[in-house]
Amino acid sequence: MALYCGDNFVYSQPAAAPGAPPTSRAPYGLSDYAAPPAAAANPYLWLNGPGVGGPASAASYLGAPPPPPGAAPGPFLQPPAAPGTFAGAQRGFAQPSASAPASPAGSAAPGELGWLSMASREDLMKMVRPPYSYSALIAMAIQSAPERKLTLSHIYQFVADNFPFYQRSKAGWQNSIRHNLSLNDCFKKVPRDEDDPGKGNYWTLDPNCEKMFDNGNFRRKRRRRAEASSNLTVPSGTSKSEGQSSRLRVSGKLEGDSPSSILRPSQSPEPPEGTKSTASSPGASTLTSTPCLNTFLSTFNTLNVNSSSSMGNQRTLPGSRRHLGGTQLPSSTFPNTSVPDSSPDSMQLSTVGGSNQLSSYYNPFSGGSSGDQSSPFSSPFYNFSMVNSLIYPRDGSDI
């Protein structure tokens, strides 16, 4: 007894009688392997079309294959089993049911696929949204015109005719078309000529933006980094005196050549004579535009006046060793030097009020030799943390 697979798992085939001779299976003829008709050679399953509509093609694609010539059945197409066995009858894959309506091709088409029926390719396109933005649709419509300009109504017509998806719910996408025409800089409005009948302005595409529409996709140009950084750089037409005045913003530069030059002020080049004679110099404009530097200089001027009134004309740095918090510093760090009244390092600065005033740009913080302990400048280590806070304020403002 042979077992075969069917719809209900397994069914049996009754064995032949022991004495009966084995039946020979008739070979298939060439007509059984003939090619399907031309109507059934369509590779695309556009249903209800000529490829599946005919009875022969329907039988070959959807029904059971033709039985072999002869009385003996094929190995996988067995007759229904006898009642009482554990198997049921084998059925075709796409046999029409009794309640199904008759197909338009007739009763000879047993395998009509009604669950996949679609009217045409246009119905499928109505369900799928085109992969283009509204700006790309407008650009395609304008580029398809002979004069490269269209009115708003003609743009609507182009989109609806070429893309069936937009034939429904026109109010939504037409509003988006109007917004893109108004907000996108690539679309320019061209007024209608006086002799041109009709109403409404024309819309055209900016020639500089034609390369932004690559294969229907709108690609906005990104702003280059060089263009963005050029807006933040200083113009190249600034004078040399302004560049020199910007260098005067930092004072008291430490020089590491020798230990004796730690507190030596930075020597800045003197401005030209033409700049001195003018009432408003680039340095004055720099001081006016930097309030932090003005506060720094005015504080030093006040300290200079107080120190000169309390100490007189004695501006000497002691050479003896000082102890500060248990730390001993060598005497070579602060050499015994004398600073004249008119120091060459002092420079002429104009104040915010516009009055020219000679003020010392640097204060050596010298202590009195008479040993006056009441003076706030009696020690050369005078509160350098306060000076640092003046030069580099803690509020985060830039000098």
Curated annotation (Swiss-Prot):
Residues 87-109, 221-287, 307-353 are annotated as: Disordered. Pfam families: Forkhead. A motif (Nuclear localization signal) lies at residues 219-225. A motif (9aaTAD) lies at residues 385-393. The keyword Cell cycle does not apply. Keywords: Developmental protein, DNA-binding, Nucleus, Phosphoprotein, Transcription, Transcription regulation. Residues 129-223 bind DNA. Disruption phenotype: Embryonic lethality due to impaired pharyngeal arches segmentation. Embryos fail to form endodermal pouches and this results in failed pharyngeal arches segmentation leading to severe defects in the skull, jaw, and ears. Craniofacial neural crest cells undergo apoptosis in the mutant embryos at 10.0 day post coitum (dpc). Conditional deletion in epithelium leads to fusion of molars with abnormally patterned shallow cusps. PANTHER family: FORKHEAD BOX PROTEIN, FORKHEAD BOX PROTEIN I3. This is Forkhead box protein I3. It comes from Mus musculus (Mouse). The gene is Foxi3.
